Structures are given as structure tokens and as C-alpha cells.
């Protein structure tokens, strides 16, 4: 990454220059997605990295690059990074906040997929749990938007995984004009009304068939879409 910024945070005897072009690698100190018993055996989701975390990572990598045979003094470098960070102005820190924002979007998309074991697992769960006679779940405005735009993204990026496509859709949704969002909100409201009507009829039929006095929503299996999870944080 060409940051266009350099700073000396080490003693003059070494004076390595920070932020020269190099590729970021996964942060080994980043927090990991906490797996539940259902998640066992799935690849963990790497946690979000803070702006300061990206800054410190660059300090370490640049020092290691310039002095590969030198034992890294963690305490000393951490101290120098902290001192330098406190003196940096907002313009100098902005790039690290941008990296953190992108990483947060990556994390959100990966957690959404991991929560359901990936796209294949979601399809299997849908086949296994959905009552074929139950009404189709109401879709969100973001989901309707995703239905329209996903083919374009997949055509332009055929190698992208489902998480990457979801992340791009989230970015696009944030930039959609309010007039366009209102159109999709109207679609979502109409679908919500349709679902409510169908669910009332469905419950009535189930009561007749089973002789139950009541039928709880907990007894009805719904299909949950990744886009619905993303839209909770995006809308």
C-alpha cells in the first residue's frame, strides 16, 4: 500500500522509515469470532482490527523488513508506536481508519455467512427445516435490492465468494438514493402484508388439522437469509 506517509519512530541509530509499500497480512493478535458448538469444525472468522491496530502492525512489519536478523523488542516498539500515534494529526490517521472500516465490513459479511455454516449449509438447513406448506418469509428492502443487483456483481466478479458479494452489496446499498430505497421499502412492506395474511390462514389450517387450541410462531420454521442479517446493520 502506497500510503504517501513516512515517520521515524525509532532511535536515530536505526531510524527505519514506516509505511513503505507492502502488503498487509492477517493480524495474529486480532480477536477471533467465538465459535459455538454448532460452529465446531468451521474455519474461524478473523476479528475486526482497529485503526491503531493497523498502525502498530505496519510498525512491526516495517521494522522486521528492515532488520530481519534483529530480535524484535516488543515493548520498545509498542512504546514508540504509541508515542507516535498520539502525535499524529487526523489526516495522517485517516488511512488507518479507512482500513479499519473496510475490515469491519469484511468481518460483518464473513460472520453473516459463518453463522449459517456457509451458503451450502444454509441451503441444506432450508431443505431440512422448512415446512413446504408454510408461507414464504417476507423479504427485506435490502434483499429485494440484492436480488436485482447480485447478478451484475457476480457477472463482473465471477471468482468472488458469497461473503465478498454480500460485502459489495452492502456498500452499494449505502449509496442508493433515498427515492430508490423507498421503492424497495414499498416492495418489502407489500411482501410483509402478504406474509401476515398467509400466516393467519396457515395457522388456521394447522389448528383445524391438529385440533390445537393455539399455534405458536416457535413451531413454524422460517428461512433466514444472509442479506436480512446484513441489512440490520446497513439500513
Curated annotation (Swiss-Prot):
Q: Please list the residue ranges the record marks as binding DNA.
A: 47-117, 135-203
Which Gene Ontology molecular function entries are recorded, alphabetically? transcription cis-regulatory region binding
Stored SUPFAM superfamilies:
HMG-box (SSF47095)
Any one Pfam family match given in the protein's UniProt record, by short name: HMG_box_2
Among SMART domains, the record links this protein to: HMG
- Which superkingdom is the protein from? Eukaryota
Report the locations given in the UniProt record. Nucleus
Stored InterPro entries:
HMG_box_dom, HMG_box_dom_sf, HMGB
Offer a single GO CC term for the protein: nucleus
Renumbered residue ranges of the record's region Disordered: 1-47
Compositional bias (Polar residues)? 1-34
Q: State the Gene Ontology BP annotations.
A: cell fate specification; gonad development; positive regulation of transcription by RNA polymerase II; vulval development; Wnt signaling pathway
Could you say which protein family the record assigns here? Belongs to the HMGB family.
Which PANTHER family does its entry note? HIGH MOBILITY GROUP PROTEIN B3, HIGH MOBILITY GROUP PROTEIN DSP1
**What is this protein's name?**
High mobility group protein 1.2
Q: Provide the species name.
A: Caenorhabditis elegans
Amino acid at each position: 500500500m502506497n500510503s504517501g506517509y513516512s515517520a521515524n519512530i525509532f532511535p536515530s541509530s536505526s531510524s527505519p522509515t514506516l509505511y513503505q509499500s507492502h502488503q498487509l497480512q492477517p493480524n495474529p493478535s486480532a480477536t477471533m469470532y467465538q465459535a459455538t458448538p454448532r460452529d465446531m469444525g468451521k474455519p474461524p472468522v478473523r476479528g475486526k482490527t482497529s485503526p491503531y491496530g493497523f498502525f502498530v502492525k505496519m510498525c512491526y512489519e516495517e521494522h522486521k523488513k528492515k532488520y530481519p536478523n534483529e530480535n524484535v523488542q516488543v515493548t520498545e516498539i509498542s512504546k514508540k508506536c504509541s508515542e507516535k500515534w498520539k502525535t499524529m494529526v487526523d489526516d495522517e490517521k485517516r488511512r488507518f481508519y479507512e482500513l479499519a472500516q473496510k475490515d469491519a465490513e469484511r468481518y460483518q459479511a464473513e460472520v453473516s455467512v459463518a453463522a449459517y455454516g456457509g451458503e451450502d449449509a444454509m441451503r441444506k438447513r432450508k431443505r431440512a427445516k422448512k415446512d413446504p406448506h408454510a408461507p414464504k418469509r417476507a423479504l427485506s428492502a435490502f434483499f429485494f435490492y440484492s436480488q436485482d443487483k447480485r447478478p451484475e456483481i457476480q457477472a463482473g466478479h465471477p471468482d468472488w465468494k458469497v461473503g465478498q458479494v454480500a460485502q459489495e452489496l452492502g456498500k452499494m446499498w449505502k449509496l442508493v438514493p433515498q427515492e430508490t430505497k423507498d421503492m424497495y421499502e414499498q416492495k418489502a412492506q407489500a411482501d410483509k402484508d402478504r406474509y401476515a395474511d398467509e400466516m393467519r390462514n396457515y395457522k388456521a389450517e394447522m389448528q383445524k388439522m391438529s385440533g390445537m387450541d393455539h399455534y405458536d410462531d416457535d413451531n413454524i420454521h422460517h428461512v433466514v437469509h444472509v442479506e436480512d442479517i446484513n441489512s440490520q446493520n446497513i439500513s
